[in-house]
Amino acid sequence: RTVRLDSPFDYGAKARALVVTDVGRDDPRQVAAAMRELFLAAGGGALGLFTAIRRLRAVHERLVEPLAERGLALYAQHIDPLDPGTLIDIFRAEKDACLLGTDAVRDGVDVPGEALRLLVFDRIPWPRPDILHKARRERFGGRGYDDAIARARIAQAFGRLIRRADDKGVFVMLDAAAPSRLFASLPPAVVVERVSLVEAIERVASHLAR
């Protein structure tokens, strides 16, 4: 017999999921500007996730000074001379800090409470098309295999936002091309909204101010 237990978290009230439709994901200036305004709207407690180190570096150099001017510390994997675990520890300890990272941070972050209240992906975390992946893809179903990996990564990252019953957070995807099927693994109560950047900023500020 299968027993289905309800989630202890009220995702419908505590979480928001947004896909921003008017940011050019290939333009680091646009991505940096979007992250800057979203991070400021959240007052920090923000994690920016990237699928490529070079894009992380390009965005970091455009973010660090504007955030510092507003009193928000910015840490970054591949830039700060610290391992991912130490960066996450610092991020966890500083309630209003911001952190940029790639897959090691995405997979390792465990930050309950206000220290993580906003999570922003620069684009869909598709698997890297290396030789091993190509072989697995051919064996396990082509695009469906890629979809399964991306869905799992998105669901895992989303799950980092709500770790306790009193947590609340906003998940943002800066990839207008993100197909809706990839969000099927999010909790059923979470409605994914496709919005402009201005609307996303407003939703982040209003949701986290409650």
Question: How would you label these PLM feature ranges?
Answer:
Residues R1-R210:
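ASCE RecA-like P-loop NTPase motor cores
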